[in-house]
Amino acid sequence: MLLEKAYRIKKNADFQRIYKKGHSVANRQFVVYTCNNKEIDHFRLGISVSKKLGNAVLRNKIKRAIRENFKVHKSHILAKDIIVIARQPAKDMTTLQIQNSLEHVLKIAKVFNKKSK
């Protein structure tokens, strides 16, 4: 099960807009940029994992764990554009640790509905 196309941020222009106009929150493993988007009624997700973190297998493992976390919480996330950037410590974490760390930083970024979390 994938996140549908409508839930993804792919265009460089969208990434740049969110970097400039969005708000950032970080912990040791992730940086999360959020930006309101009134044109859509659901969240959109962009993931950035630098080549400095490791080979393609490792980077894809991190991206899969991030996407899985958003799939699990899909109905509880506000309609925002969200970019998740993985930092160096994320490469040594298990999938469960990645999900716990990501949930922590997403709560700080206030992307969850108040009634759900």
UniProtKB/Swiss-Prot annotation:
Keywords: Endonuclease, Hydrolase, Nuclease, RNA-binding, tRNA processing. It is an enzyme of class 3 (hydrolase). Its EC number is 3.1.26.5. The keyword tRNA processing applies. Belongs to the RnpA family. This is Ribonuclease P protein component. GO terms for molecular function: 3'-tRNA processing endoribonuclease activity; ribonuclease P activity; tRNA binding. It comes from the Bacteria. It catalyses: Endonucleolytic cleavage of RNA, removing 5'-extranucleotides from tRNA precursor. GO terms for biological process: tRNA 5'-leader removal. RNaseP catalyzes the removal of the 5'-leader sequence from pre-tRNA to produce the mature 5'-terminus. It can also cleave other RNA substrates such as 4.5S RNA. The protein component plays an auxiliary but essential role in vivo by binding to the 5'-leader sequence and broadening the substrate specificity of the ribozyme. The keyword RNA-binding applies. SUPFAM superfamilies: Ribosomal protein S5 domain 2-like. Consists of a catalytic RNA component (M1 or rnpB) and a protein subunit. InterPro entries: Ribosomal_Su5_D2-typ_SF, Ribsml_uS5_D2-typ_fold_subgr, RNase_P, RNase_P_CS. Pfam families: Ribonuclease_P. It comes from Staphylococcus aureus (strain bovine RF122 / ET3-1). One of its GO terms (cellular component) is ribonuclease P complex.
